[in-house]
Amino acid sequence: MLLPSLGGSPAAWNAAMVFFQTLLLAGYLYSHLSLKWLGIARHRFLHAAVMLLPLLVLPIAMPAGWSPPAESDPTIWTLLILAVMVGAPYFALSTVSPTLQHWFAHSDRPGKAEPYMLYAAGNAGSVIALLSYPFLLEPFMGLKQQAWAWAVTYFGFLVLLAMCSLKARSSHDEQITGKEEPASWSQRVRWMAYAAIPSVLLLGVTRHIGDEIASFPLLWIIPLTLYLATCLLYTSPSPRDED
């Protein structure tokens, strides 16, 4: 939707990736703090509001009257238009993985002590969607059709999410067996630094490809695919874990 206005600018792609990574971090932070402070029972009501909020802006469409600046850097404009168009839906979706992991860990399902396999499932879905969209979806559906299909799919997803929430125990006082001591702040800072390194490399390599090789969106997805595939490998359970 933005390409007709911005063209094939690598700066626009990088701005979009910064936007989505920042909002993803915000969604994780929301899930962590709200579940910690409210517990599962009260969190359900807050999370229901968060997940229903995107319905107010669906189907996703380009706002009327918005056009990028003709002579200045479009980065700020790109961030603003993304916030208006997909800010609420993406923030809601960014909360799903950590929330589902918490619910799963507080359910009666086998393997609840290691809910991180859901990260692998989410990363696998991201890789499949990223690689299949240019070849299986975009050539056969217009933007309006895609927007409406996404809106209908999101509504169905909400129904499934509500069913999952009922499987989690309501008591926020229950503790997972084998819980470790909280990490120190020095450990947390190191973890954030380690996570920032591949993100910075992703942006830098993508910008280099766009500036020095070709300003071609299909090339830009290669670094992102490798980034997601690495996350998939890291979060997938190993044979030793299954033993």
Region spans (language model):
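Alpha-helical transmembrane segments of multi-pass membrane proteins
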Residues: M1-S236, R240
